[in-house]
């Protein structure tokens, strides 16, 4: 593997399916799909010279994937550092896999459980913390418990990361809105790290510049059909990167994305 990685991270969505329906999560317009093990292997082979750090998440619940163990083994064999974002409803069921193929970090979206009445919170919390204790005891996996600092019930200590114990954290974040070309917000001025520090690959192989493009609106190509070099050198990819060099969004979805305001200091 190349010692110098071009991207700090690449998001790889192994499934677009989810077992919850959260109000804050943008509706997925794509059909439910699971990336096959062979397809995932191809993805890893084709991004290997560009990064050694992947997030198994864009949309969907990665612990739903029936071949999760095989996927994590491919990552392990390729010396990939893996982050995994989950609602943790299946963490007890998938614990043997997570113990056999430990990941670098598991991000638990606690606000997902709070947003779904179908979840028995007592059972959820018990299974989550029991699984966390096992992982912390038997692996080097770091666990980040994420909460959103909402306007309705704000945390007094604001937005920050608090260490509970070694490798276990509470991460309080501000909510964000998924970009939508039909939203009232529109501003072509701004900055984004898409295709500079990160990019995303959807479960059908579609490459997009950013993990907030959950519906593949800015499809740059398909990594199962083309090399990443070919995709990144395409006219659309080049225009995207050149635009943000000038602090200008050229894609309609980016114009309607307020998340780029978080990088205003780079203007």
Question: Would you name each region that the model predicts?
Answer:
Residues 1-8, 212-267:
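Flexible mid-to-C-terminal extensions adjoining Fe-S/redox cofactors in radical SAM and related proteins
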Residues 58, 194-196, 218, 227:
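A conserved catalytic-core signature of glycosyltransferases
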Residues 201-202:
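Short, acidic, Ser/Thr-enriched surface-loop or helix-capping motifs
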Residues 65-195:
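Conserved AdoMet/S-adenosylmethionine-binding subsite of the radical SAM
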Residues 18, 22-25, 192, 210-211, ...:
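Short cysteine clusters
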Residues 1-105, 117-119, 264-267:
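Conserved alpha-helical substructure of the radical SAM core
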Residues 12, 16-19, 186, 248-251:
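Processing junctions and N-termini across compartments
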